[in-house]
């Protein structure tokens, strides 16, 4: 291989020298032998040298192939990802453009090396991005004008940055509508196939906390996903304040007057509320209102799952009720650890056997509160339920009808209930066999509503319907008030009152110090 690389003239000179050496004598023969030995050594070294150069050539080819693959990946990345990372949606902006690719090939006697040179040309953006000094202003302006959003490159991937971190309200409302639609489809496929009408019975009367309680209840009822009629029985006759509150609900309202006024004694109030509920049941029977009857007091708290459970009742059902009896006032004595452990579970509801049928009732134990309960409305003491509360029962309205298809024999006639003037404590008085009650809420294991009685004093002053007609009187002046003359008068009055209070405090301090000194003198 080395010979093939030598020029032809050198080959001729070598051949002539070899022929001259052969024609020489004995000394020349020995020299020829030496020359032949040297030629043989050169011939032995020639294959090793050619192998070395062949391997070196192959190694250089592999290196060039690897580098060419790497450069091709870089070229592919620059061509197809530069626009996505650095370009903007504005037509006036421009991105990095690959202008030219120069390939230089250098050939030597041993190998061929290819060098790829990439030339990138960038054009200035006529609309540069906003500086970091005014990020919020620039982002707001960009969002309002519909300009491009900035990008941050991490490695080979771009991270999109919103012009403002808050979500788009249109997208939020669209997501809410999608979720609402999904929930409707889930209820349609997996919920109640044929939902029944819900009849909610609420006794109420005009008082300080009526607006508070009715507002909370009406918002709960508005979220019920079933057809609903709200039957409100008002003690002392219907009032405009109650009617205006009920009109805000956008529900089907039946506002019924009750002739008796609500008493201020808790025991009498419980009895009056029971008669009001019984009056509502008679109205339901007279109008033949079909549905499921739920007794929802205005001060109770209801779970929406309750209205799903009542759809399962056949004639009369019962749910567990949480009793919130503690007032939490500052003067209430703290309970010891032993009393806390012995405190009864504040739950009223059905108790089931192993087969899931009604076996009895779990009632609220009021013995630990003996002598500590409130007797008058507004008194700062615990208010306890009397026996089983109506709120824990659910009725099928057809149980009240005189003639109903499939009405069981263990149901009493509504006209026979309370005809002798006996007190009606709970709906079980409507049944001849109370064991036929159906336990709901996973056999009473789920608490679906909470019984609570929170009331203001009977003589408390409050605006009618909590609507303030005249402007409020200024009690404490503001630092910057639009009535400077009133502020001056009030400031003077406040200063005088503070001086009077300070004088009284000093006089009490003087009297106490004098009494201490007199006592010390007597002891001495």
Curated annotation (Swiss-Prot):
Cytoplasmic side: 1-51
Residues of this chain annotated as glycosylated in UniProt: 132, 135, 240, 353
Compartmental location: Golgi apparatus membrane
Keywords: Cell wall biogenesis/degradation, Glycoprotein, Glycosyltransferase, Golgi apparatus, Membrane, Signal-anchor, Transferase, Transmembrane, Transmembrane helix
Record GO terms (molecular function): galactosylgalactosylxylosylprotein 3-beta-glucuronosyltransferase activity; xylosyltransferase activity
Its membrane topology: Single-pass type II membrane protein
Biased composition (Basic and acidic residues): 495-513
Entries under Pfam families matching the protein: Glyco_transf_43
GO cellular-component term (any): Golgi membrane
Membrane-spanning parts: 52-71
Lumenal face of the membrane: 72-524
Enzyme type, top EC level: transferase
Region (Disordered): 21-41, 492-524
GO terms, biological process: cell wall organization; glucuronoxylan biosynthetic process; plant-type secondary cell wall biogenesis; xylan biosynthetic process
Domain of life of the organism encoding this protein: Eukaryota
PANTHER family from the UniProt entry: BETA-1,4-XYLOSYLTRANSFERASE IRX14H-RELATED, GALACTOSYLGALACTOSYLXYLOSYLPROTEIN 3-BETA-GLUCURONOSYLTRANSFERASE BETA-1,3-GLUCURONYLTRANSFERASE
Functional summary from the UniProt entry: Probable beta-1,4-xylosyltransferase involved in xylan biosynthesis in cell walls.
Sequence similarity: Belongs to the glycosyltransferase 43 family.
Record protein name field: Probable beta-1,4-xylosyltransferase IRX14
